[in-house]
Amino acid sequence: MTEPLHTSSNGGAERGPNAAFESEKTLQTTTRLQRFDSLHMEAGKIPGGQSHTAKVGWATTLHLAFQSIGVVYGDMGTSPLYVFSSTFTNGIKDTNDILGVMSLIIYTVVLLPLIKYCFIVLRANDNGDGGTFALYSLISRYARISLIPNQQAEDAMVSHYKLESPSNRVKRAHWIKEKMENSPNFKIILFLVTILATSMVIGDGVLTPCISVLSAVGGIKESAKSLTQGQIAGIAIAILIVLFLVQRFGTDKVGYSFGPIILTWFIFIAGTGVYNLFKHDTGVLKAFNPKYIVDYFERNGKQGWISLGGVILCITGTEAMFADLGHFNVRAIQIGFSVVLLPSVLLAYIGQAAYLRIYPEHVADTFYKSIPDPLYWPTFVVAVAAAIIASQAMISGAFAIIAQSQILGCFPRVRVIHTSTKFHGQVYIPEINYVLMVLCVAVTAIFQTTDKIGNAYGIAVVFVMFITTLLVTLVMVMIWKTSLLWIALFPVIFGGAELIYLSSAFYKFTQGGYLPLVFSAILMFIMATWHYVHVHRYKYELRNKVSNNYVAELAVKQNLARLPGIGFLYSELVQGIPPILPHLVEKVPSIHSVLVIISIKYLPISKIETKERFLFRYVEPKEYRVFRCVVRYGYNDKVEDPAEFESLVIENLKQFIHEESLYSQSSHSLEGESIKEIGGVTDPTSEVQDAMSSRNNSDQHTTEPRNGCMDEIQSIHKEMGNGVVHLLGETNVVAEPNADFLKKIIVDYVYNFIRKNFRQPEKITCVPHNRLLRVGMTYEI
């Protein structure tokens, strides 16, 4: 079997010294077909599908903006419940400090969520999807920095894979790209930074429900003054337990109500803010003058800096604007923030500041104290509902991130259940759900007040925002057409502000600030260990792949039985024959009548059209009916159930055989193994049409497939009736004998402990046990 690509040491296709530079321009156009058995060339024949970035009408945009209010802005919208109490933990000594803090809140909200995220970060999306993984995937597609060496040149021909390369500053970008690709340390650091950010966001799935529900329920003290803080925490815990227990039902059926509830919440807090402003002190509007920030720090010094740990809570949930972008679009998120959230929360804070100028002693319960008596109970009910919705959004976000991490080989196997037929990103993970529930209950029971939880929450919020700043800076340098001046200003202004806030949050490390770091350290260790072994397991298969002549040798063996039916042999290896095949033949001297060696591969892209998913090739000799198949998914794609997957593979295999038969009769002779990409054959690009037209003009009889092709398709159809058997490798990974002590601990004990305590592959794929054959093999890495 002749491989179309030669893999270099870093897993990419070997090219000349100038090829990488030139390839940046060729990603945007389909390379003209040179030969019909070229996987690299044939991958470009399919027209791209529609992405999130496609232009939509204003009616659709406004509808999406309304939906985003309930999904994206619940967390940031509930911040007025606890910001002032978390900032003035020791009370208000000077009422002028209220103006200083109010000014800090105004310009923090304007600088980070509005300017940084709405106008800059949202542009760094991956075909309409956002979040840390989206940024990492953008950088990974532009520069080969993946730690798993399974890149193929044809990956760049996937429609959503294409990037707009910087034309006017391509030399600078190319120089940085080369440095990144040639630096193993940079690849590792970038990966660790990415999983640190994702770990922090997953940790928010613990902290957001705690602080949101606890602060909302705390308002009941205004009506039931006899309740102790412990009893209030108990009520919050009961609500949290119910919240996690209903996660398995998904939010599809009740999600439509999120928007109206959160919008009602914004109307309540904005209206209350206007009421308090005109009733108590309109002078707080002076806080729009940033001079009061300077006065505040001059007056309070170190204590002013420490209070920033509370101020930063006014932008909790900002990252959700970017992370949830895939469900909406950039314009909808921008409208939702600037038209609804921004004026509502600013009015809420201004109203509370006006109230505190008159009643500074009420700072611990500012929100509920400032509500007019007739609106108390309606506001309380809406506040609890809004807190639950904000918590729901972060829990769902944690599930989605873990699902993405698992797909990219960065998280142990867990069962991902899709709870919505409308939104592919809404998933439920039972194991993670109950872990989050236990952690939420424990944190709420131990800390009981929003002040201490806020100390932890602040670190998590700013840490993720700072990492986003670093990754977007890389995108600006390499991918965007951005001048060096703007590139320098972005991390200096936004990164500088975030570091100041982060330093303040770290000051309260011992008062709860350690929580997100402990969560993140544990998650990072699990993710890094799993990915480390995942990478080395792939490299083991790459080093030990079997000779291309192996199948030809099998074909002449007389004692090798051919079993009825079709066998799907799974391997991560995308090039060559995996070592598990000869191991299987040695233990069970038989092979199915049709054998498809399947590699399921995830690209650093959010989604792949079904018509671009399957790549096939023959393994010589053709008459032996052994095929290689690479099945490509994006990190947000839903994997089909076994029955649907089997049907798709077989139908695309038949289509491949038919197309290969047509191509093989053309004047372009096939050499070695024949390769085709399946899908979209009824709508080829002009290059394929030109080639086909030229071929047909020279040889009219080639428009009909050879007779053997129809026999082969009928044979596969017949074997399909005999059933499909899934052959899953059950690899026992151990450290090689000469490995150092630390590696043996990580591989032999830590990794294997994680593997045994998470789900096994067949439980993830739901393959029926009566059609599953597990093939055991030991890998020494």
Curated annotation (Swiss-Prot):
Protein known as: Potassium transporter 5
Keywords: Cell membrane, Ion transport, Membrane, Potassium, Potassium transport, Stress response, Transmembrane, Transmembrane helix, Transport
Presence of the UniProt keyword Cell membrane in the record: yes
Listed GO CC annotations: membrane; plasma membrane
Membrane topology: Multi-pass membrane protein
Residues on Extracellular side: 85-100, 209-225, 279-304, 356-381, 448-458, 503-512
Residues passing through the membrane, by range: 64-84, 101-121, 188-208, 226-246, 258-278, 305-325, 335-355, 382-402, 427-447, 459-479, 482-502, 513-533
Major location category of this protein: membrane
Gene Ontology MF terms: potassium ion transmembrane transporter activity
Record function comment: High-affinity potassium transporter. Its potassium transporter activity does not seem to be affected by high sodium and low potassium concentrations in the extracellular environment. Invloved in salt stress tolerance by enhancing root potassium uptake and translocation to the shoot to prevent sodium influx during salt stress. Involved in the positive regulation of disease resistance against the rice grassy stunt virus by promoting potassium transport and increasing endogenous plant potassium.
UniProt subcellular location: Cell membrane
Regions annotated as coiled coil: none
Name of the encoding gene: HAK5
Residue numbers on the Cytoplasmic membrane side: 1-63, 122-187, 247-257, 326-334, 403-426, 480-481, 534-781
UniProt keyword Transferase, yes or no: no
Catalytic activity: K(+)(in) = K(+)(out)
